[in-house]
Amino acid sequence: MIPIVIKSKYIKKITPSIFLKIIYKLLSESKIKLLSEFLFLMQIRPRDIIYLWPGSSMALLGKIKRKGNIVVIENINCHKQISKKILDDEEKRLNVQHVHLITKISIDNECEKLNLCDYVFSPSPLVTQSLLDANVATDKILASSYGLHQYQQVDPVINTQPSNKPLEVIFVGRVGVRKGVHLLLEYWREANINGVLKVIGSVEESIQDLMEPYRGIENIQFINFVSDIERVYKEADIFVLPSLEEGSPLVSYLALGAGLPCIVSPMGGEGVVSDNVNGFVIDAHDKLAWIAALKALENSPELRQKFSQAARQSSDKFLWRRVGQQRSALLLDKLQGK
């Protein structure tokens, strides 16, 4: 939701304790959104560049364009047209339902927004490709990334753990078909790794039945919530993310910052993880390759250490201040002459 923008210093001061509480009690979510967008619209000056996230309405975008302002949209995931096909195919393969909420109306709405905006930030190569596949003009797309904060980086250390120590492998995110967790659990069970797989995140209703066969397995832990996610990364040995559809998941950037060797799908980390440099980038459905990657990291502490050092080093280029500078340069370059 777009934040309510208020000029009055007095109102700003009391907003958290009084103003917003009253609004939330008196108005529905849809009316709060309308009010937020109205107040936001009132603050726009003639030469402002407007940056919108997916939750903003088509009506707001239309009003801003009629004012003559340049609008930049953030596309946090693949184009919905592409996402729906990927998830529909997996839904059919698994014989499950309600994997996603993407409708033709929401696809048409996204197409209309992308047609009307001036530029769109894409956080990953596959998001960029999905936009191109959906006929978004190449010169509208600003290819970038997401990132991490410096405090989320871990100082590199030499691994002195014995080579036969059980590994701690982590998955972090919503546990659903979209993230490919059902595939990961199958691969993990068949790989027979000396270690534990920690699946950290809430399990979506659509995948509950698929999780049941794995709940009694000793070396698989389902953890619904953790209060200190950074500690989880620090204590882990390997990060895994076999996503079928993503934007550019922040959890992958955190894995680099923690110096974790990564095994990810292209959706889970392409553009962030470099294959055979700081991890492996493997098609989510390539079962044999996933098992081989898990075994390779289990059997070689040297490879884990090599990937770990490369991961931590590569995280430097994804620090938010650098990503912000890169995004600013991209946009300024496009705006030259406008």
Descriptions of predicted regions:
Residues 261-264:
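Short hydrophobic beta-strand element within catalytic cores of glycosyltransferases
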Residues 114, 225-226, 232-236:
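Short alpha-helical donor nucleotide-sugar binding micro-motif in glycosyltransferases
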Residues 93, 98-155:
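Donor nucleotide-sugar binding/catalytic pocket of nucleotide-sugar-dependent glycosyltransferases
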Residues 244:
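Aromatic "clamp/platform" in nucleotide-sugar-dependent glycosyltransferases that forms part
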Residues 149, 157-179, 185-190:
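Conserved donor-binding/catalytic core segment of Leloir-type glycosyltransferases
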Residues 275-276, 280-287, 296-301:
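Conserved acidic donor-binding segment of nucleotide-sugar-dependent glycosyltransferases
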Residues 208-226:
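Nucleotide-activated donor-binding/catalytic signature segment of Leloir-type glycosyltransferases, i.e.
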Residues 15-26, 71-108:
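Acceptor-binding helix/loop patch of EC 2.4 sugar-transfer enzymes
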